């Protein structure tokens, strides 16, 4: 847990431009791992914030015509400041409007990580792909989709699901931790985007080990929380997840991490 230990010592400032539904949960989750969240949205202050921040999450869950130009502006400011961006294209396949905006953003600015479920990432590379809300199709080949997205956007790809796929540095990693309860809590996936941003430490080309650890820390904490005798369902799972992120130790991490597959390709 080299990266998590560093977070707990250095408390990296992590900026989250995220959706209205999840701001509180995201901020509390970042505090639980030791990061310092700031839910700053004003382009007017971005330049000052981004000089000292370590990572930026852009999550378009509550995208509107009023905020789309602000999102592009802060992404471009982050590029100018050398601040890595984690982009979460929430429900990108649900509407033409969302898909067009996501593609515009990805043309207007360079992101360091694109994180989403298989349907969302597929929608970024296939104009015919559709989805229902933020739900993903379990039958999609996430590794193939991640590889194609990586080739298209030349950036790290994290696909979440029953198994999680990370593609970076011409490597494909499959991780097998997590809990079904994550799908029963609004904002769990959005929090993972913030956690990944907290692990970047201003690395615009993130090391794949940082991404593996970020996803594994989050999902192992979810497993432990779900197994807690006091966990009766989604309502008790959420605070237990925060507690477990706060207390997670090296022994538990090493005992539980499941890297199911490592693939190198050109």
Swiss-Prot record:
For binding ATP, which residues are annotated in this chain's numbering? 115, 160
User: Its catalytic activity?
Assistant: 5-(2-hydroxyethyl)-4-methylthiazole + ATP = 4-methyl-5-(2-phosphooxyethyl)-thiazole + ADP + H(+)
GO MF annotations for this entry? ATP binding; hydroxyethylthiazole kinase activity; magnesium ion binding
- Name the EC number(s): 2.7.1.50
Listed cofactors: Mg(2+)
Going by the UniProt record, its keywords in alphabetical order are:
ATP-binding, Kinase, Magnesium, Metal-binding, Nucleotide-binding, Thiamine biosynthesis, Transferase
Question: In its UniProt record, which GO terms are filed under biological process?
Answer: thiamine biosynthetic process; thiamine diphosphate biosynthetic process
Q: Does the keyword Magnesium apply?
A: yes
Pfam annotation, one family: HK
| Highest taxon of source | Bacteria
Name this polypeptide is given = Hydroxyethylthiazole kinase
Q: List the Gene3D superfamilies hit by this protein, alphabetically.
A: 3.40.1190.20
InterPro entries on file: Hyethyz_kinase, Ribokinase-like
The record's NCBIfam families line, in alphabetical order, gives: PRK09355.1
Q: Look up the record and name the pathway of this protein.
A: Cofactor biosynthesis; thiamine diphosphate biosynthesis; 4-methyl-5-(2-phosphoethyl)-thiazole from 5-(2-hydroxyethyl)-4-methylthiazole: step 1/1
Family, according to the entry, reads as follows: Belongs to the Thz kinase family.
* Function, in words: Catalyzes the phosphorylation of the hydroxyl group of 4-methyl-5-beta-hydroxyethylthiazole (THZ).
Protein residues bound to substrate:
39, 187
């Amino acid at each position: 847990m080299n990266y998590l230990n560093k977070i707990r010592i250095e408390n990296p400032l992590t900026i989250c431009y995220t959706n209205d539904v999840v701001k509180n949960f995201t901020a509390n989750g970042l505090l639980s791992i030791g990061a310092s969240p700031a839910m700053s949205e004003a382009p007017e202050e971005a330049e000052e914030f981004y000089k000292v921040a370590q990572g930026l999450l852009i999550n378009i869950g509550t995208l509107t015509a009023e905020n789309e130009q602000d999102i592009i502006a802060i992404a471009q400011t982050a590029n100018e400041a050398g601040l890595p961006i984690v982009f979460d294209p929430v429900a990108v396949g649900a509407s033409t409007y969302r898909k067009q905006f996501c593609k515009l953003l990805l043309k207007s600015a360079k992101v360091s990580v694109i994180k989403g479920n298989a349907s969302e990432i597929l929608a970024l590379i296939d104009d015919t792909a559709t989805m229902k809300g933020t739900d993903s199709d379990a039958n999609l080949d996430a590794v193939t989709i991640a590889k194609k997205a990586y080739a298209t956007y030349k950036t790290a790809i994290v696909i979440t699901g029953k198994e999680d796929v990370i593609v970076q540095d011409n490597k494909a990693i499959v991780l097998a931790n997590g809990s079904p309860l994550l799908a029963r809590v609004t904002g769990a996936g959005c929090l993972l985007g913030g956690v990944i941003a907290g692990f970047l430490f201003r690395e615009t080309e993130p090391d794949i080990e940082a991404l593996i650890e970020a996803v594994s820390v989050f999902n192992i904490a979810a497993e432990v929380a779900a197994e807690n005798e006091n966990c009766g369902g989604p309502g008790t799972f959420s605070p237990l997840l925060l507690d477990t992120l706060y207390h997670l130790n090296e022994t538990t991490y090493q005992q539980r991490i499941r890297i199911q597959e490592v693939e190198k390709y050109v």
